[in-house]
């Protein structure tokens, strides 16, 4: 069964932002460790708005086409597709990096590794960094 069909009662024409967030959160509870956050990020992506916009417009009616797109995004996430691959973007040290199915998604542990390396390397030391692999180039950046 598709996400669109399963969420149809909650995604009826004229659904508000808060209703869509609630439906999305419920849909992802069985497949995500952070269903509310995932629902928020996916709805913001479907709307092409920042996540903070959602809370400023909880009672706003979401266009039917956008709600359908959101349902499709929820279906991808429920199928365990990484959020960064769905949205095509992942933050790394506050930089927005493009992500595709061909790249490894930067992980929080990698940020910690970079922080540890920067603490141990003298600030005046000249060096070159090679970021090898199939990632986004986040470490070298």
Tell me what each language-model feature is.
Residues 1-53, 59-62:
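Non-catalytic accessory regions of SAM-dependent methyltransferases
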Residues 2, 41-119:
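Conserved AdoMet
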Residues 20, 35, 102, 106, ...:
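Generic hydrophobic secondary-structure packing signal
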Residues 21, 39-40, 70, 83, ...:
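A general structural signal for well-ordered alpha-helical segments in protein cores
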Residues 28-29, 75, 122:
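A general structural signal for alpha-helical elements within enzymatic catalytic domains
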Residues 109-141:
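Conserved SAM/SAH cofactor-binding pocket of Class I
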